[in-house]
């Protein structure tokens, strides 16, 4: 069990370090990759997911996502007694990963005066704030993610191909569905760094948009549950 928890912790740490690292590189001032755009962010997140799964896959199932963890438990693939420890490990990894992003880009954070840009390197936010639409966006994106992960399990792949497919899937979801909310798809990916945004001493950071914070938590869990329901028909 400890190996599995360490795998979930380490994998989620790598996920946030690389994923929010690319966001910081695109958004924060005076970086080499500043203003390189949404396609770079989606590609970066796809690579981040693939690398994180490769790193942690020998230690744990590499769920790295509370919504996926709950979905697997609903499907009967994980004992419910393991769900909370997995989620806690994922949140711990996400929070430490975000601290490393902050350390990596500290001079650039200090040069940034726009509070919205700073928050964007920690957590997601909607392009247009609309509670119902934003919630649907997170539900749909996570539904596609979890259903596809389950479907991939029906096929025999050579080692690593499934992981590459999931990374590609993240890019696809980001390009197709992610432009509305920034596609959290993962409660730990959003809430863990959002908590660190409130804690870390960053000039001009503003607030953490906590009125929105429930959507990237609840939406992915609903999406994962719907994916379990649909997959039961396969």
From Swiss-Prot:
A motif (NPA 2) lies at residues 186-188. It comes from the Bacteria. It catalyses: glycerol(in) = glycerol(out). Coiled coil: none annotated. Keywords: Cell membrane, Membrane, Repeat, Transmembrane, Transmembrane helix, Transport. GO terms for molecular function: glycerol channel activity. GO terms for cellular component: plasma membrane. It is found in: Cell membrane. Pfam families: MIP. A motif (NPA 1) lies at residues 65-67. Gene3D superfamilies: Glycerol uptake facilitator protein. It is a multi-pass membrane protein. The chain crosses the membrane at residues 9-29, 37-57, 61-81, 83-103, 135-155, 159-179, 214-234. Its main location: membrane. Mediates glycerol diffusion across the cytoplasmic membrane via a pore-type mechanism. Aquaporins contain two tandem repeats each containing three membrane-spanning domains and a pore-forming loop with the signature motif Asn-Pro-Ala (NPA). Belongs to the MIP/aquaporin (TC 1.A.8) family. This is Glycerol uptake facilitator protein.
